[in-house]
UniProtKB/Swiss-Prot annotation:
It is an enzyme of class 2 (transferase). Belongs to the NAD kinase family. Its main location: cytoplasm. Its EC number is 2.7.1.23. It comes from Acidobacterium capsulatum (strain ATCC 51196 / DSM 11244 / BCRC 80197 / JCM 7670 / NBRC 15755 / NCIMB 13165 / 161). This is NAD kinase. It catalyses: NAD(+) + ATP = ADP + NADP(+) + H(+). NAD(+) binds at D68, G69, N142, D143, R153, R170, D172, Q242.
Protein backbone atom coordinates (compact mmCIF):
# COMPACT_ATOMS: atom_id res chain seq x y z
CA UNK A 1 0.00 0.00 0.00
CA UNK A 2 1.24 3.50 -0.85
CA UNK A 3 2.36 5.34 2.27
CA UNK A 4 2.18 9.05 3.08
CA UNK A 5 3.69 10.69 6.16
CA UNK A 6 1.97 13.63 7.87
CA UNK A 7 3.88 16.15 9.99
CA UNK A 8 2.01 18.80 11.97
CA UNK A 9 2.71 22.04 13.77
CA UNK A 10 1.93 22.07 17.51
CA UNK A 11 -0.84 24.16 19.00
CA UNK A 12 -2.88 24.76 15.83
CA UNK A 13 -6.55 24.47 16.77
CA UNK A 14 -7.73 23.91 13.19
CA UNK A 15 -5.79 20.63 13.05
CA UNK A 16 -8.27 19.01 15.45
CA UNK A 17 -10.81 18.91 12.60
CA UNK A 18 -8.44 18.98 9.62
CA UNK A 19 -6.36 15.91 10.49
CA UNK A 20 -9.24 13.40 10.85
CA UNK A 21 -10.66 14.70 7.57
CA UNK A 22 -7.28 14.40 5.83
CA UNK A 23 -6.66 10.90 7.16
CA UNK A 24 -10.11 9.79 6.01
CA UNK A 25 -9.31 11.12 2.52
CA UNK A 26 -5.99 9.28 2.44
CA UNK A 27 -7.53 6.01 3.64
CA UNK A 28 -10.34 6.41 1.09
CA UNK A 29 -7.85 6.82 -1.75
CA UNK A 30 -5.86 3.74 -0.87
CA UNK A 31 -3.02 5.32 1.09
CA UNK A 32 -1.49 4.15 4.35
CA UNK A 33 -0.95 7.35 6.37
CA UNK A 34 1.52 7.58 9.24
CA UNK A 35 1.60 10.62 11.51
CA UNK A 36 4.27 12.12 13.71
CA UNK A 37 4.00 12.43 17.47
CA UNK A 38 2.84 16.05 17.24
CA UNK A 39 0.01 15.20 14.83
CA UNK A 40 -0.94 12.45 17.28
CA UNK A 41 -1.98 15.10 19.81
CA UNK A 42 -4.90 15.93 17.49
CA UNK A 43 -5.97 12.45 16.37
CA UNK A 44 -5.22 8.76 16.80
CA UNK A 45 -6.77 7.60 13.52
CA UNK A 46 -3.43 6.58 11.98
CA UNK A 47 -0.27 4.81 13.02
CA UNK A 48 1.95 7.08 15.12
CA UNK A 49 5.70 7.23 14.48
CA UNK A 50 8.20 9.60 16.16
CA UNK A 51 9.12 12.33 13.71
CA UNK A 52 12.80 11.38 13.60
CA UNK A 53 11.85 7.81 12.63
CA UNK A 54 9.44 8.69 9.82
CA UNK A 55 12.07 8.26 7.06
CA UNK A 56 12.32 4.59 8.04
CA UNK A 57 8.68 4.19 6.96
CA UNK A 58 9.67 4.88 3.32
CA UNK A 59 6.76 7.19 2.46
CA UNK A 60 6.31 8.35 -1.12
CA UNK A 61 5.19 11.81 0.05
CA UNK A 62 5.38 13.96 3.17
CA UNK A 63 2.51 16.33 3.95
CA UNK A 64 3.54 19.23 6.19
CA UNK A 65 0.73 21.07 7.98
CA UNK A 66 2.03 24.25 9.55
CA UNK A 67 4.24 27.18 8.68
CA UNK A 68 7.71 27.65 7.26
CA UNK A 69 9.28 26.48 10.53
CA UNK A 70 7.47 23.15 10.31
CA UNK A 71 8.67 22.74 6.73
CA UNK A 72 12.27 23.52 7.72
CA UNK A 73 12.12 20.85 10.43
CA UNK A 74 10.63 18.30 8.02
CA UNK A 75 13.24 19.12 5.38
CA UNK A 76 16.06 18.29 7.78
CA UNK A 77 14.40 15.05 8.92
CA UNK A 78 13.97 13.86 5.32
CA UNK A 79 17.10 15.53 3.90
CA UNK A 80 18.83 12.30 2.91
CA UNK A 81 15.78 10.48 1.54
CA UNK A 82 14.72 12.52 -1.49
CA UNK A 83 11.05 12.17 -0.51
CA UNK A 84 8.92 15.03 -1.96
CA UNK A 85 7.22 17.38 0.50
CA UNK A 86 3.80 18.96 0.10
CA UNK A 87 3.72 21.92 2.47
CA UNK A 88 0.40 23.46 3.47
CA UNK A 89 0.38 26.91 5.03
CA UNK A 90 -1.25 27.15 8.45
CA UNK A 91 1.17 29.81 9.67
CA UNK A 92 1.33 33.56 9.23
CA UNK A 93 3.61 34.40 6.28
CA UNK A 94 4.06 31.02 4.64
CA UNK A 95 6.77 32.03 2.19
CA UNK A 96 7.90 28.43 1.67
CA UNK A 97 4.64 26.72 2.62
CA UNK A 98 2.85 28.43 -0.21
CA UNK A 99 -0.01 25.92 -0.67
CA UNK A 100 -3.11 27.42 0.99
CA UNK A 101 -5.30 25.12 3.05
CA UNK A 102 -8.13 25.44 0.54
CA UNK A 103 -5.94 23.89 -2.16
CA UNK A 104 -4.79 20.87 -0.13
CA UNK A 105 -7.06 18.28 -1.74
CA UNK A 106 -6.57 19.69 -5.22
CA UNK A 107 -2.84 19.13 -4.76
CA UNK A 108 -3.41 15.63 -3.39
CA UNK A 109 -5.58 14.78 -6.39
CA UNK A 110 -2.81 16.09 -8.61
CA UNK A 111 -0.28 13.93 -6.78
CA UNK A 112 -2.47 10.84 -7.13
CA UNK A 113 -2.75 11.52 -10.88
CA UNK A 114 0.98 12.28 -11.31
CA UNK A 115 0.18 15.84 -12.37
CA UNK A 116 2.38 17.71 -9.90
CA UNK A 117 5.69 19.44 -10.49
CA UNK A 118 8.71 18.87 -8.26
CA UNK A 119 10.83 21.91 -7.42
CA UNK A 120 14.27 21.12 -6.03
CA UNK A 121 15.83 23.42 -3.44
CA UNK A 122 19.52 23.31 -2.55
CA UNK A 123 20.57 22.59 1.02
CA UNK A 124 23.63 23.66 2.99
CA UNK A 125 26.00 21.18 4.63
CA UNK A 126 27.59 22.45 7.84
CA UNK A 127 30.25 20.89 10.06
CA UNK A 128 31.38 22.23 13.42
CA UNK A 129 35.01 21.39 14.14
CA UNK A 130 36.74 21.87 17.49
CA UNK A 131 40.45 21.23 18.06
CA UNK A 132 40.62 19.52 14.68
CA UNK A 133 37.75 17.11 15.41
CA UNK A 134 34.22 17.16 14.04
CA UNK A 135 31.70 17.88 16.79
CA UNK A 136 28.52 17.70 14.72
CA UNK A 137 27.16 18.15 11.22
CA UNK A 138 23.87 19.39 9.84
CA UNK A 139 21.93 19.84 6.62
CA UNK A 140 20.05 23.16 6.47
CA UNK A 141 17.47 24.42 4.01
CA UNK A 142 17.65 28.10 4.99
CA UNK A 143 20.82 28.97 6.84
CA UNK A 144 23.31 28.47 9.60
CA UNK A 145 23.92 31.41 11.92
CA UNK A 146 26.54 32.32 14.48
CA UNK A 147 24.99 34.74 16.97
CA UNK A 148 25.64 35.99 20.47
CA UNK A 149 23.44 35.71 23.53
CA UNK A 150 22.43 38.36 26.04
CA UNK A 151 25.81 40.09 26.34
CA UNK A 152 26.03 43.12 24.04
CA UNK A 153 29.56 42.45 22.85
CA UNK A 154 30.77 41.67 19.36
CA UNK A 155 32.66 38.58 18.27
CA UNK A 156 35.83 38.27 16.20
CA UNK A 157 35.50 36.21 13.04
CA UNK A 158 37.56 35.12 10.06
CA UNK A 159 36.14 33.88 6.77
CA UNK A 160 38.14 31.78 4.30
CA UNK A 161 36.95 30.76 0.84
CA UNK A 162 38.58 27.69 -0.72
CA UNK A 163 41.53 28.13 1.64
CA UNK A 164 42.09 31.84 0.94
CA UNK A 165 41.36 34.64 3.41
CA UNK A 166 38.29 36.71 2.59
CA UNK A 167 38.11 38.94 5.66
CA UNK A 168 38.74 39.11 9.39
CA UNK A 169 36.26 41.34 11.20
CA UNK A 170 34.21 42.08 14.30
CA UNK A 171 30.43 41.69 14.19
CA UNK A 172 27.39 40.59 16.16
CA UNK A 173 27.29 37.41 14.09
CA UNK A 174 27.44 35.81 10.65
CA UNK A 175 24.76 34.20 8.46
CA UNK A 176 25.60 31.64 5.79
CA UNK A 177 22.54 30.92 3.70
CA UNK A 178 21.23 29.11 0.66
CA UNK A 179 19.27 30.90 -2.09
CA UNK A 180 16.11 29.67 -0.31
CA UNK A 181 17.37 31.26 2.91
CA UNK A 182 18.08 34.55 1.15
CA UNK A 183 14.52 35.67 1.97
CA UNK A 184 14.83 34.78 5.66
CA UNK A 185 17.23 36.12 8.33
CA UNK A 186 19.81 37.12 5.72
CA UNK A 187 17.29 39.46 4.07
CA UNK A 188 16.58 41.12 7.43
CA UNK A 189 20.35 41.70 7.78
CA UNK A 190 20.45 43.48 4.38
CA UNK A 191 21.53 40.43 2.41
CA UNK A 192 20.62 40.03 -1.28
CA UNK A 193 17.68 38.04 -2.61
CA UNK A 194 18.66 35.10 -4.81
CA UNK A 195 16.31 33.11 -7.01
CA UNK A 196 16.09 29.52 -5.73
CA UNK A 197 17.77 28.04 -8.82
CA UNK A 198 20.93 30.17 -8.50
CA UNK A 199 23.95 27.99 -7.73
CA UNK A 200 25.42 30.12 -4.95
CA UNK A 201 25.77 30.68 -1.22
CA UNK A 202 25.48 33.94 0.71
CA UNK A 203 27.68 35.17 3.55
CA UNK A 204 25.99 37.99 5.49
CA UNK A 205 27.76 39.63 8.44
CA UNK A 206 25.36 40.82 11.14
CA UNK A 207 26.10 44.42 12.18
CA UNK A 208 29.81 44.33 11.24
CA UNK A 209 32.06 47.01 12.71
CA UNK A 210 33.34 47.91 9.23
CA UNK A 211 31.71 50.29 6.79
CA UNK A 212 33.16 48.39 3.83
CA UNK A 213 32.13 44.85 4.79
CA UNK A 214 29.02 43.86 2.90
CA UNK A 215 27.19 40.59 2.18
CA UNK A 216 29.03 38.30 -0.20
CA UNK A 217 27.66 35.91 -2.84
CA UNK A 218 29.99 33.02 -3.64
CA UNK A 219 29.85 30.11 -6.07
CA UNK A 220 27.79 27.11 -5.07
CA UNK A 221 30.76 24.73 -4.95
CA UNK A 222 32.73 27.00 -2.60
CA UNK A 223 34.27 25.62 0.59
CA UNK A 224 33.57 28.21 3.28
CA UNK A 225 35.27 28.27 6.65
CA UNK A 226 34.14 30.59 9.42
CA UNK A 227 36.56 30.69 12.34
CA UNK A 228 35.42 31.95 15.71
CA UNK A 229 38.46 33.93 16.87
CA UNK A 230 36.87 35.61 19.88
CA UNK A 231 33.31 35.59 21.17
CA UNK A 232 31.29 36.59 24.23
CA UNK A 233 29.76 33.93 26.43
CA UNK A 234 26.58 32.28 25.17
CA UNK A 235 27.42 32.39 21.49
CA UNK A 236 25.69 29.73 19.42
CA UNK A 237 25.63 28.06 16.06
CA UNK A 238 21.99 27.84 15.00
CA UNK A 239 20.65 25.72 12.14
CA UNK A 240 17.50 26.95 10.39
CA UNK A 241 16.68 28.86 13.58
CA UNK A 242 15.75 25.59 15.31
CA UNK A 243 18.80 23.61 16.41
CA UNK A 244 21.58 25.25 18.42
CA UNK A 245 24.96 24.33 19.87
CA UNK A 246 27.19 26.50 22.07
CA UNK A 247 30.46 27.66 20.51
CA UNK A 248 33.96 28.03 21.92
CA UNK A 249 36.84 30.26 20.89
CA UNK A 250 38.76 28.59 18.09
CA UNK A 251 35.77 26.67 16.71
CA UNK A 252 35.51 26.39 12.94
CA UNK A 253 32.28 26.15 10.98
CA UNK A 254 32.80 24.57 7.56
CA UNK A 255 30.00 25.07 5.04
CA UNK A 256 29.42 23.93 1.50
CA UNK A 257 26.52 23.11 -0.75
CA UNK A 258 24.92 19.85 0.34
CA UNK A 259 24.73 16.82 -1.91
CA UNK A 260 21.06 16.61 -0.87
CA UNK A 261 18.13 18.69 -2.06
CA UNK A 262 14.62 19.32 -0.78
CA UNK A 263 11.90 18.39 -3.25
CA UNK A 264 8.81 20.58 -2.96
CA UNK A 265 5.54 19.56 -4.60
CA UNK A 266 3.93 22.26 -6.71
CA UNK A 267 0.69 22.22 -8.69
CA UNK A 268 0.53 25.00 -11.25
CA UNK A 269 3.02 27.62 -12.30
CA UNK A 270 3.27 30.07 -9.39
CA UNK A 271 6.75 31.54 -9.77
CA UNK A 272 9.28 32.72 -7.21
CA UNK A 273 8.71 36.39 -8.04
CA UNK A 274 4.94 35.93 -7.84
CA UNK A 275 5.47 34.77 -4.25
CA UNK A 276 7.85 37.69 -3.59
CA UNK A 277 5.21 40.17 -4.69
CA UNK A 278 2.39 38.45 -2.81
CA UNK A 279 4.20 37.71 0.46
CA UNK A 280 6.89 40.41 0.75
CA UNK A 281 5.16 43.12 -1.33
CA UNK A 282 8.18 43.13 -3.65
CA UNK A 283 8.33 46.23 -5.85
CA UNK A 284 5.32 47.96 -4.30
CA UNK A 285 5.40 51.69 -3.57
Amino acid sequence: MRRIAVIAKPQKDELASLLPELLAWLHGHGYDPVIDDIAATYTSEARIVPRADLPNENPELVIVLGGDGTLLAAARVFAKTGVPILSVNLGSLGFLTEVPLGDLYRHLEGWAQNCCNIEQRAMLHCELRRDGHQVCEYEALNDVVVSKGAIARMGDFRIDLDGALVAAFRADGVIISTPTGSTAYSLAANGPILAPNVDALIVTPVCPHLLTLRPLVVQGNADLKLKVAGIPDQTYLTVDGQEAIALCVGDEIHCRKSVYTVKLVRLGSTGFFDVLRAKLKWGER
